Amino acid sequence: MFNDIIVNVKGGSPPLIKILVKGAVSSSQMKYIQLPFIIILSILASCSDADFDIVIRNGTIIDGSGYAAYTSDIGIINDKIVKIGDLSKQTTKRTIDATNQVVSPGFIDSHTHAIRGIFDVPTAESSLLQGVTTLTDGNDGTSPHPIDAHFQKIENAKISPNWAVFVGQGTIRKEVMGLENRDPTTSELSEMELLVQEAMEDGALGISTGLFYIPGSFSLTSEVISLSKIAASYGGIYISHMREEAADVLKSVNETINIGLEAKIPVQITHHKIIGKENWGLSKETLRLVDDAIKGGLKVSIDQYPYTAS
């Protein structure tokens, strides 16, 4: 016959420690049981009393706010930063010495096509080893469909980085109209709007276009505005591979800004560049257009990739 000796550590429920002792336990025998209990409880208490789970000490912090780099400690509890400052007198379960190292938030890669490889290499070391912890996909008007099924696949794959997607205007158009080069009917436009609504409700960041590519190139500006209004109603953004990045780049920037104004949606001009040596210098004008739009109250941003493509 075994008797249970159950000890609650700091009032924990259910009990954290349970020992089975064969036969009755006399008071004289209890002293031999109490000593290991005391040791175990002391160890557990010392662990649970730590101020932080992790402290990153003496790192050069660049926090993304625009402020200059500074040296400090970072305290983490339950995977969340809870304090930044001098934590030299605080206790921690684990210490990371970041002396002469840079500590920053993980980078967000705002334009990827990582869906082409994320299921083959779910750990995504090529991104993580560069400090990129969030990948966005669904760019250039092409996205997974439907979004909710895609997120379930991502969840099942247990990928390492954070993951976000846009709903692609080209994907939605193709779903409703195929690759036909014409304007949508009223009912077709309504169907596309409903699909954008469903995607936003399933967690899309916003709507993307690839107006340089088929079938996005078949779409009038008014069609894009209608779909962007749906995304805007859910707090989404509009990100675009514009129609033209060469001689007519100014028209494309103006179109992109106009979509933002009409749909009342923040705008991101993706991989902005000027293609063709004969067009170099037009970036002065494109940036002026963007600056003017920002001064007028529209949220406009630009991303670029760090390699030659013009």
Report each predicted region and the residues it spans:
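Histidine-rich, glycine-flanked metal-binding segment
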Residues: 51-54, 61-105
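C-terminal motif of bacterial Sec signal peptides marking the signal peptidase cleavage site
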Residues: 44-46
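Histidine/acidic residue-rich metal-binding segments in metalloenzymes
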Residues: 184-209, 215-310
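Histidine-centered catalytic micro-motifs
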Residues: 106-117, 238-244
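Positively charged N-terminal leader segments that act as targeting/secretion signals
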Residues: 7-17, 23-25
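Sec-dependent signal peptide recognition
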Residues: 31-38
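Divalent-metal coordination cores built from histidine and acidic residues
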Residues: 98-103, 107-112, 120-209, 228-229, ...
